[in-house]
Amino acid sequence: MRLTKEQKVTSNQLESDRERYSAYLRSLPFTINLGSHLVVHAGVRPGVPLRRQMVTDLTEIRTMGANPSSRRGLPWYKVYRGRRIVVFGHWPSKAPRLAPRAIGLDTGCVYGGRLTGYIIESNQFVSVPARRAYAAPKR
């Protein structure tokens, strides 16, 4: 695997604590169930029960079809009709992505955009500008 310049810098910064951070990250769940909402990194495969989701669905999915990591195709959240509202990231846009049963929060902070959060109780977004761009946008 080849690391980008930014990834190499991060890797060097974390080297002394690599095992501690790795153990911590491995201990985290792939989903956070908040009752009415489900928090995931990337999304869920519509029609597949949560217990049968593949790790790659939860961490990489963007669209339906042969290459779910692709930015081209039908977005999973436009098809999803599950019981819980899915709060997800992994797909940067200028504003949160809103669908009937999904909320996308990735507003490109790593690329110099904004860091956005969502307050479930009041159905409100909170957003602050990034301090800087940490990586170049992917094309």
Please give the residue ranges for each predicted region.
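Acidic, His/Gly-rich catalytic cores of divalent-metal-dependent hydrolytic chemistry
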Residues: 48, 55-139
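Short, well-ordered beta-strand micro-motif
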Residues: 33, 41, 117-119
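Active-site neighborhood of divalent metal-dependent phosphoester bond hydrolases
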Residues: 1-38, 46, 52-72
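Active-site-proximal beta-strand elements of phosphoester/diester hydrolases
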Residues: 37-43, 104-105
